[in-house]
Structure formats: structure tokens, C-alpha cells
């Protein structure tokens, strides 16, 4: 059981780091695509930076609730 708990804590740490990354990216202060993959933008204006796993919902503005699970793995323009 302790092993599962450690795994759970690591997952939560990773999510919190992603939330921090997304928050900085939406404010324009994060380095581009650190640990992410680039996907071409359909509009031709550069690309979007996505996590390799999880959700790929685009964020158009800073969400009021930064603890929202949708931010744990998201794409950012």
C-alpha cells in the first residue's frame, strides 16, 4: 500500500508541475515546450505546445481555477 501511495504522490507532483507550467505559459513567462512536443497549428500561426500524455484541450485564456484537472495535461497556443 505504501508503494501505491508513493506512486500517487509522484503523479500529483507531476500534475502540479504541469499546472505551474501551463499557468506560466498562458502568462507568457514559461520557456517554450520544455518536456513537451510541438504540434502544428491549423491556423498556421506557429504551433501549440502539448503534453505527451493526457488531454489535449486548448486553453485560450487563463482559467480562474488553476487547480482544475483539465490543466494537468493541456495544450497551449
From Swiss-Prot:
InterPro entries: DUF5540. It comes from the Eukaryota. This is Putative uncharacterized protein encoded by LINC03041. It comes from Homo sapiens.
Amino acid at each position: 500500500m505504501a508503494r501505491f501511495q508513493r506512486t500517487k504522490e509522484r503523479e500529483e507532483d507531476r500534475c502540479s508541475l504541469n499546472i505551474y507550467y501551463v499557468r506560466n505559459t498562458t502568462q507568457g513567462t514559461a520557456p517554450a515546450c520544455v518536456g513537451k512536443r510541438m504540434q502544428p497549428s491549423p491556423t498556421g500561426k506557429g504551433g501549440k505546445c502539448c503534453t505527451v500524455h493526457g488531454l489535449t484541450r486548448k486553453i485560450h485564456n487563463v482559467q480562474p481555477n488553476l487547480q482544475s484537472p483539465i490543466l494537468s495535461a493541456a495544450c497551449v497556443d
